[in-house]
Amino acid sequence: MKKIIAIALTALVALSASAEKADVGKRAVIDYTTLLVDEVAQVTIVTGNIIVTKGTLMLRAEKAVIKTSPEEDMQITLTTIPGKMASFRQKRDGGPDPWVEGEAQRIEYDERTAVVKLVGNAHIRQLEGSTMTDQIKSEFISYDSMREVFAARNDASGASKPGQGRGQLIIAPRKARTAPAPAAPATPPAPTDAS
């Protein structure tokens, strides 16, 4: 069992996707319908079709609770109404048009560490343009865009628990393969002289 887990974790590391490094220094822009700011507690609550943009990072949900650390880094928790999903999308460095996107019942984003956690019915996809290259489905997925690491667990707590279900990893072919050339037709045997 430990060997299977080690192989799965190795596969997840191989699926690494680096977020666009320029996003780190960008300002955050938050669109909302309703806003409540508590300066003493350093908490902001926004509701109503929330869109958070920070460089190429885009987070969407129905509600966001934004806490500011003493170092002035944001921790954002996005939730939504039943039947809907919170989502994120971010451009990655490298390649012609690489992206990573995902959705879950709850999304947590830590500005200091650039980690996105997807909790509850989580899905994450890597794309080249609009073509999916890889996908992970699990109850909990953590995406560390600075270290280029994905981690998935079968329980929304972020732990792997026996009997809690299974995740799924889909890996697309890395390059197009050409069909092998057709085999040459078999040469009929030469006629034999039976006389």
Question: What is each residue range found by the language model?
Answer:
Residues M1-S195:
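Mature-chain termini and adjacent capping regions
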